[in-house]
Each structure stands twice: as C-alpha cells, then as structure tokens.
Amino acid sequence: MGTRLPKPANGAVFKRLPEGGVLFSTEDEVYFGVGIVGARIWELLPPATSTVEEMVDILSAQYRDVSAAQIREDVDRFLKELQTNGLVSAVATDPAGT
C-alpha cells in the first residue's frame, strides 16, 4: 500500500485553462493559478488515483524526460502547498498503520 493522497476540499473549485488552471477556495474566496503540471496533479487527485505512487507513475509516463524522483518531490511540494491553502483535506491516518 502506498502513501494515500488527500482529497480535494469541499470548498475547492477547479477550472481547466489552456495554460494550466485556476483553483478557487470558496471558504477564503481566493484564487490560485496553477501551471499545466499543477493542473494535471489536481486532476489526478482522488477519485482518479488513490496513492502518491500511482500518481507519480502516471506523471512519469507523461513526462518521460523527468525522473520519477523529481516528479515525486514536485508532487509532494505541490500537495503541501494545496494543504496549506486549504484546497485539499488532510489525509486521515489509519491507527493500524495500513
């Protein structure tokens, strides 16, 4: 089992644009612009994928000129930014550690 992905927050609205996308927090009433890769990461959040590893595999197949390690680092950083801005929910931890 891999690292579970956070889910989009209930108050997060996403609009795809040719150059990436825009996220809107209905709670904070703030817009966030994201690039093409950020938009793709957003689109791969649950229910599209359930783990970070699954997301990295998909992105690695799309961006073959970037190492999986670099993609993982970028995904982790972007997910932290989304969480900091309240655009994704925190991942619930399983007390059994699974």
Stretches found by the model and what they are:
Residues 1-29:
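Long, low-complexity, charged/polar intrinsically disordered regions in eukaryotic proteins
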Residues 27-98:
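Long, charge-rich, low-complexity alpha-helical segments
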